[in-house]
């Protein structure tokens, strides 16, 4: 049995396979996921699991070089933006429009769907390297 925080085997495999610059999207329950993009659906019901908790666990094993969020996140859901900043304190953030974020989902290695019901509660984590 694994000793680290992340127990989900699908997420563990995804993180282990990431290369420098690969993107993983962690999204709210309503984020549209392109059919060609791998979907890892963790949503159980409204609010479970929450986005920030999901980011916390994924970031515990993933080397994150930068994070992208929608400009609308800070405007409509500042507590999500603030929470992401606390979880990823040494990570640079870039803001893009919500439409650009949705378009970037097509280039992501996977979209992780959470049960989050907060508007614009989505983040793209860009993989870094540990050396």
UniProtKB/Swiss-Prot annotation:
GO (cellular component) term, any one: cytosol
Q: Name one GO molecular function term.
A: intramolecular lyase activity
Q: In which pathway does it act?
A: Carbohydrate metabolism; D-ribose degradation; D-ribose 5-phosphate from beta-D-ribopyranose: step 1/2
Record-stated family: Belongs to the RbsD / FucU family. RbsD subfamily.
Query: HAMAP family attached here?
Result: D_rib_pyranase (MF_01661)
Taxonomic classification? Bacteria, Bacillati, Chloroflexota, Chloroflexia, Chloroflexales
Top-rank taxon of the source lineage equals Bacteria
Q: Tell me what this protein is called.
A: D-ribose pyranase
């Amino acid at each position: 049995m694994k000793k680290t925080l992340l127990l989900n085997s699908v997420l563990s495999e995804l993180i282990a396979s990431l290369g420098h610059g690969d993107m993983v999207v962690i999204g709210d329950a309503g984020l549209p996921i392109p059919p060609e993009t791998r979907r890892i659906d963790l949503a159980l019901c409204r609010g479970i699991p929450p986005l920030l908790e999901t980011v916390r666990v994924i970031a515990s094993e993933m080397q994150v070089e930068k994070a992208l969020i929608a400009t609308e996140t800070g405007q409509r859901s500042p507590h999500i933006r603030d929470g992401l900043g606390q979880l990823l304190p040494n990570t640079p953030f870039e803001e893009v429009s919500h439409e650009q974020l949705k378009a970037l989902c097509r280039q992501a290695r996977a979209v992780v769907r959470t049960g989050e019901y907060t508007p614009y509660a989505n983040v793209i984590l860009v993989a870094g390297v540990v050396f």
